[in-house]
Amino acid sequence: MAWRNRRGALRAILSGSHCTRPASVYDPISMRIADDLGFEVGMFGGSVASLAILGDPDIALITLTELAEQVRRMSRAAALPVLVDADHGYGNALNVRRTVQELEAAGAAGLTIEDTLLPQAFGETQPQLISLAEGQGKINAALDARGDPSLVIIGRTGALAITSLDDAIERAQAYQAAGVDALFFTGVKTRPQLDAIAAATTLPIVLGGPSEAITDWDYLAERRVRIAVQGHAPIAAATRAVFETLQAVRNGAAPKQLSGLAAAELMQRVTRGDVVDERCDHFLGLKRS
């Protein structure tokens, strides 16, 4: 697979002048839908990965192997660049190296490495951060492990919601100095916070869950925010649709009584049925009806 074009597309977003909303994607079908609808980039969040792969909440139970396998399936299904939430890199700095290598091979356009202490330690009721020195070590390891220089590596900090704005800026500046391609912040709620972050750094910014108070897209673009992640509604919508459909079937509804189902034309489109038909005809001499 030629992943470099996708990585170049993500880099173009980060070096551009506007703020884009990524599609929250989690499997091959959601990747294809997002690609068909014209999204510029997909975001494969950690919480979504846990739901899609394990059916569990986001408590750091997923393994690197499971994540990489899903990213590979998604990357093969559509040409959409996908930015992968690689959580804490699945261990220490040496584990981070392996994480980068596996996700790069799986076709990720980019990935984020964060400084949250994961999994949550015994007896801790609130999220904690690793030390700045350990965070720098992880970022250095990630950059060193990158085989394709076009792979986007983003340093992520959760300090704003856990410690302070000053700490978030200090960590971001350290990751910037290490050589990351962009900075990812969670917990940004106000314009003064974002103004301070933008003034103290020079790299493109990715925001996770920005508050409504700052989601003016022109303002975000002026502050170098190039990607703003606004939750993961698609998997929640899909879960409700499956629940309601199965509930109706369990209550005795006949197939013709079910509503909200994808039309045959849509199913043909998202499964790339026309491509499969052509290949069956060409290689097997079969006509699929």
From Swiss-Prot:
The UniProt entry, under Gene3D superfamilies, shows: Phosphoenolpyruvate-binding domains (3.20.20.60)
A biological process (GO) of this protein is: oxaloacetate metabolic process
Name the keywords, alphabetized: Decarboxylase, Lyase, Magnesium, Metal-binding
This protein's cofactor list reads: Mg(2+)
Q: List residues traversing the bilayer.
A: none
Per the annotation, how and in what number is the cofactor bound? Answer: Binds 1 Mg(2+) ion per subunit.
Q: Does the entry feature the keyword Lyase, yes or no?
A: yes
Reported EC number(s) for this entry are: 4.1.1.112
InterPro entries in the cross-refs: ICL/PEPM, Oxaloacetate_deCOase_bac, Pyrv/PenolPyrv_kinase-like_dom, Pyrv_kinase-like_dom_sf
Catalyzed reaction equations: oxaloacetate + H(+) = pyruvate + CO2
Q: Which GO terms describe its molecular function?
A: magnesium ion binding; methylisocitrate lyase activity; oxaloacetate decarboxylase activity
Biological role:
Catalyzes the decarboxylation of oxaloacetate into pyruvate. Seems to play a role in maintaining cellular concentrations of bicarbonate and pyruvate.
Its quaternary organisation is: Homotetramer; dimer of dimers.
Q: What is this protein called?
A: Oxaloacetate decarboxylase
